[in-house]
């Protein structure tokens, strides 16, 4: 059984954001489990749908981009748009996960979680198990 300090379920904005933050803190024994691919929920948005909250390129002045998920990053810079579509935002999430070399297992569906004395035992669809001291879902 694979063992990690932290297991994150889901590679959307929250999952990629928390993984990037833990990576910034130097945590090495973590994994992100995603049942499809990074940003898949955003890829499913209707083509016409865009973020209401604009992305601003103000990181250079020390301000955060509310749509950014990793410190020092901005969808406005990466995508050259203030109001990204779901498809473009999914691309941003994949850029972040690739740039920071986040440990992601795509096509890994969680079917059961059991809490025990040593943390969480996570059963995945293929019948395998992963253990994590902490679980973020």
Predicted segments, located by residue:
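Short, glycine/charged-enriched secondary-structure capping and boundary segments
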Residues: 22-23, 45-49, 119
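Glycine-rich nucleotide phosphate-binding loop and flanking beta-alpha elements
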Residues: 15, 39, 112
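N-terminal Rossmann-like FAD-binding beta1-loop-alpha1 element of flavoenzymes
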Residues: 2-32
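Feature captures the FAD/FMN-dependent oxidoreductase FAD-binding
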Residues: 75-137
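Glycine-rich active-site loop/strand segments that organize a redox cofactor
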Residues: 37-90
